[in-house]
């Protein structure tokens, strides 16, 4: 549940930068990052100085810590309805999802402060900013030396850990939503419906020449926000980061030589490849919601001071560009909402939804900056984040190479009018609602034209991942008259998150509810998948069963 918001009254006097509260890195010359108590103290200081901000909690962690958020806008708003009345883009920026990756947390605190206390016109005149600086608050408090918790990172001296207190990777949890942090963020997404979601991270991998790398939503199912961010926002951000902020940035990825098997073509030995497109990752998930997701990855081999500076600059430029393109972004998100509303009523309007994809095989060829790493011959000497026996040279060169930065569909599905779940699938219905999806319930048995899925094979992963043995199904859809019992759950695709409905409920989806074992007790080779596809939800579509022609659906309340 979204916490109550406290608003600070306007600042009574003009402050100078000398009056501003300082983040933990600023106070320690970037030797240290903020503890949870430091973040709370910093936010309390902003409130005490009457910064024009609103403060709240998105929810609690499993260990009971509040997850603070801050709202900044001019005029100041404190509720989602007030924000929507302004008609501006809402930008949700999150730091510290992986608590060892610290610069997002500290950069976001500093940026909130600087924007709030600025007396000059700035982005807050054109957007609503929601900042969540310490999302993985429990993981943040498990401090240990950087050499233990973040071996490939150049400081600070002590950092938190990647997972939350339940040992869950929060950036693999957006579909199954098992962590309280994830459930809290989904509630914020549903309540505020941000147009843009920015997730702040630090890289783990290759030695390249960029202060920061970025990615849009990579899933081909992100047909609105993913493509718009890739083609219209991120190229502009790249240029502005270079010319305005003196930082070289590039599309997120690693050198193929550092990640064997990243591409199918084993004859390619030098290239650059991005990461996984599935919606378990937050920014990929957000694109399938019909919004814009942007991943930010500071360069782990840079110093903490430089990582904070590059992340600060990147978020600042994102906010500036969103402010400039506010009308276009609001129009895009409105179209993303309206397109699925016709599904089931106008078959010609239905757009195929990608549920499985693969890395492109025809990459772009681009210049990529590499750093030369040398063998030192002395395994006793180490540099932070550098393997023993190797050393950074500070020598960079530009190499022309293939860049694999996007995915193409391998399996599409046409959205039906609705999916129907068995009356006993209450856990699935509850999780769908948590994703902001409307779920109805039939009040009597009925029949309708549709199709059922026959399971030919069940492929279960031998190893656990995030506490699960992931499942993949193979089979076939077969058309026919479907008999549906009373109290069935009905999930129409004609709703703003219609594409997400398809992705989560299709049995062959590469990251749907089937993947995460939500239907395991109902799966049998040769049997029927427990979710049915219905072609027509209208009274005419149900006319095949005259006894139930008067059936209606009622919204399930609990």
Cite the ranges covered by each PLM segment.
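Bacterial N-terminal signal peptides
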Residues: 1-6
